[in-house]
Amino acid sequence: MAPSQVEDISKTELETPEHCPGPESEQAGKEDACNGCPNQSICSSQLPQGPDPDLPLINKRLSQIDHKILVLSGKGGVGKSTFTSMLSWALAADEDIEVGAMDLDICGPSLPRMLGAEGESIHQSNSGWSPVYVADNLGLMSISFMLPDADSAVIWRGAKKNGLIKQFLKDVNWGEHLDYLVVDTPPGTSDEHLSVTTYMKEVGIDGALIVTTPQEVALLDVRKEIDFCRKANIKILGLVENMSGFVCPNCKGESQIFRPTTGGGKKLCEDLKLPYLGAVPLDPRIGKACDAGESFFDSYADSPASSAILDVVDALRDQIEISLEKLNI
């Protein structure tokens, strides 16, 4: 059973302004967004606060995790969550590797469906919140496990999202050791991104994996995501181009659905001097596997998309090792 403070969240009354800086911020009660908030006078009259007392707890929890990867995209619908699920399955294919997936797309959680964990719930113990395990070495945490049903909307503003993300990072017990934590985020650069990068900064993030599709309308927003990473001092581990051509499951022929009118993801990486991890073809069976909550690699191991994804995962792990070698120089 989920902790009492997160039960029935779909019925929680929302009183915080849309761009609330948060009661712990130096700008609490002073921003334009605070005007009209019933708590404005309380926030603005508080004495300056010291460091967040939860940060040491977050650092202690995350220090048990070797590698932390953010999966980002500028545009929605490019397959970011789909790729997060496949990355998680691929890493967990090695039984000696412990993997955790954290779904921070608070208003649109989809990992539980893709990883076959819909309808599950969180359990609490003395050591924290227990993730839902979809395999012996693959655990998942998502707000979806706290909702009354799958159709319940989460209509939260920034401060509430910030609070839940803090609880996920502070209270989820991944066990004594985790090799990889893969964090799925919503599209764009929103409260979720600011919160997770702020809280994880001290303990260290290996970097971000950015997902795009070939067409320029997606690359426009990817450039903004890259700019966000650079301003937030998040290393970009690389970019993967998803839905890069359509492979017919019957004849194996390939055609371009989303044409790379400006050169696609590879050209973008060349221009911005970023690692290009590879391209994954559009295969309708990926969607079928995600809807069924099954590993695409188990169901379609010989498909071109399966080989392409595994190549991207290998390239990603190489980038992580390169980063570690540079730190040790």
UniProtKB/Swiss-Prot annotation:
* Residues the record lists as binding [4Fe-4S] cluster 1: C20, C34, C37, C43
GO MF term list? 4 iron, 4 sulfur cluster binding; ATP binding; ATP hydrolysis activity; ATP-dependent FeS chaperone activity; iron ion binding
Task: Enumerate the residues binding [4Fe-4S] cluster 2.
Answer: C248, C251
Q: Where is the composition biased (Basic and acidic residues)?
A: 8-18
Which residues are involved in binding ATP? G74, K75, G76, G77, V78, G79, K80, S81
Q: How does it assemble?
A: Heterotetramer of 2 NBP35 and 2 CFD1 chains.
Instruction: Tell me the segments the record calls region Disordered.
Output: 1-33
Q: What does this protein do?
A: Component of the cytosolic iron-sulfur (Fe/S) protein assembly (CIA) machinery. Required for maturation of extramitochondrial Fe-S proteins. The NBP35-CFD1 heterotetramer forms a Fe-S scaffold complex, mediating the de novo assembly of an Fe-S cluster and its transfer to target apoproteins. Required for biogenesis and export of both ribosomal subunits, which may reflect a role in assembly of the Fe/S clusters in RLI1, a protein which performs rRNA processing and ribosome export.
The subcellular localization recorded is: Cytoplasm; Nucleus
What are the required cofactors?
A: [4Fe-4S] cluster
What are the protein's UniProt keywords?
4Fe-4S, ATP-binding, Cytoplasm, Iron, Iron-sulfur, Metal-binding, Nucleotide-binding, Nucleus
Q: Which InterPro entries does this UniProt record tie to the protein? A: Mrp/NBP35_ATP-bd (IPR019591), NUBP1/Nbp35 (IPR028601), P-loop_NTPase (IPR027417), YlxH/NBP35 (IPR033756)
Q: What is this protein called?
A: Cytosolic Fe-S cluster assembly factor NBP35
Family per record: Belongs to the Mrp/NBP35 ATP-binding proteins family. NUBP1/NBP35 subfamily.
Does the keyword Methyltransferase feature in the UniProt annotation? no
Task: Explain how, and how many, cofactor molecules are bound.
Answer: Binds 4 [4Fe-4S] clusters per heterotetramer. Contains two stable clusters in the N-termini of NBP35 and two labile, bridging clusters between subunits of the NBP35-CFD1 heterotetramer.
Q: GO CC terms on record?
A: cytosolic [4Fe-4S] assembly scaffold complex; nucleus
Which terms under GO biological process does the entry name? iron-sulfur cluster assembly; tRNA wobble uridine modification
The answer on whether this UniProt entry bears the keyword Transcription regulation reads no
Superkingdom of the source species: Eukaryota
